[in-house]
Swiss-Prot record:
Function text: Catalyzes the conversion of dethiobiotin (DTB) to biotin by the insertion of a sulfur atom into dethiobiotin via a radical-based mechanism.
GO BP term, pick one: biotin biosynthetic process
NCBIfam families documented for this protein: bioB
EC top class named in words: transferase
Residues involved in [2Fe-2S] cluster binding: C105, C137, C197, R269
Family the entry assigns: Belongs to the radical SAM superfamily. Biotin synthase family.
GO terms of molecular function: 2 iron, 2 sulfur cluster binding; 4 iron, 4 sulfur cluster binding; biotin synthase activity; iron ion binding
The protein's name: Biotin synthase
Length: 335
């Protein structure tokens, strides 16, 4: 049983071991939820950030991520789309802001950013979103040091680059990019002064040990990622994981709660697969530390609750919308 006075939960750490994370992940659920709530209340207010996600360029990705319908290796029937023009993207951002979102995330189905007109347009989009008074986030694969610096100069708030799963299970999910490639990308983002958005997916066929290992990598980043998206697999026909069954909502609750304990100040984002959770399960996730959601009826190529449904949910829960920009009080190890 967790002792709420336990010193190992009293400060922010960067030296978590896989075995102790696995122990936390497997605690009796009521104890795990209790400890996560204590830590969440200690380090955060009960506010939820509303982030809107838009697919700027859809389909045709050269990576072979087995969960993704945008991969050229997938036979799913998604409608590919070339990169939208700057004006169209900014109009979408304006709509998201009008609906209440304060963070606009833009996704490109790329293996990596390439210099040229598409990248220059990306920079314009970032500047335009910031001029609207919103946080700007980009997810577009790997990038160079110079590209990261140019994005920082454009005012990019955060760059998303997920680890997906544990280092050990990773080879079962993707082989066209290494785990180290992902870590190097995150390092470049951090070195450029851009906030890091980095999380993973559960329900890929991994076990609890893999989940603990993923959380070990994330929680030992120094500083912690400012945002940690926790996704559950949305099995899409035509992808390599189309036969995977939905995870139980308790597994998502455990993952959210454990992430909150390990990374007390990070925004823990309840992400893909949220539509499959009951209203009650989502409320428990908020109680256990989730303080950000993707807001709007679509996440890249998967569905999501509507603006109206989410506004009603948050009103029923009684949490406030978080309008504090992600400048984030970064706690860094002094060791």
């Amino acid at each position: 049983m967790i002792n709420s006075d336990n010193q190992k939960f009293s400060k922010i750490r960067f030296d978590w071991a896989r075995d102790e994370i696995l122990e936390i992940l497997n605690y009796p659920l009521v104890d795990l939820m209790w400890e996560a709530q204590i830590i969440h209340r200690r380090f955060n207010e009960y506010k939820v950030q509303l982030a809107s996600l838009f697919s700027v360029k859809t389909g045709g990705c050269e990576e072979n991520c087995s969960y993704c319908s945008q991969s050229i290796y997938s036979s799913s029937q998604i409608k590919s789309h070339p990169q939208f023009e700057v004006e169209a993207v900014l109009n979408r951002a304006k709509t998201a802001k009008k609906e209440g979102a304060d963070r606009f995330c833009m996704g490109w189905a790329w293996r990596e950013i390439r210099d040229g007109k598409p990248f220059n347009s990306m920079l314009e989009m970032v500047k335009g979103v910031k001029e609207l008074g919103m946080e700007a986030c980009v997810t577009a694969g790997m990038l160079t040091d110079e590209q990261a610096l140019r994005l920082a100069d454009a005012g990019l708030t955060a760059y998303n680059h997920n680890l997906d799963t544990s280092p050990e299970y990773y080879k079962n999910i993707i082989t066209t990019r290494t785990y180290q490639d992902r870590l190097e990308t995150i390092k470049r983002v951090r070195n450029a002064g851009i906030n890091v958005c980095c999380g993973g997916i559960i329900g890929l066929g991994e076990n609890n040990g893999d989940r603990a290992s993923l959380l070990e990598v994330l929680s030992n980043m120094n500083p912690h990622p400012e945002s940690v998206p926790i996704n559950s697999l949305v099995a899409i026909e035509g992808t390599g994981l189309e036969e995977k069954k939905e995870i139980d909502s308790i597994e998502m609750i455990r993952m959210i709660a454990t992430a909150r304990i390990l990374m007390p100040k990070s925004k823990i984002r309840l992400s893909a697969g949220r539509e499959k959770l009951t209203k009650e399960a989502q409320i428990i996730c908020f109680q256990c530390g989730a303080n950000s959601i993707f807001y709007g009826d679509e996440l890249l190529t998967t569905s999501n609750p509507s603006f109206q449904d989410d506004r009603k949910l948050l009103k029923d829960v009684g949490v406030l919308f978080n309008k504090d920009f992600e400048y984030c009080d970064k706690t860094v190890s002094t060791v």
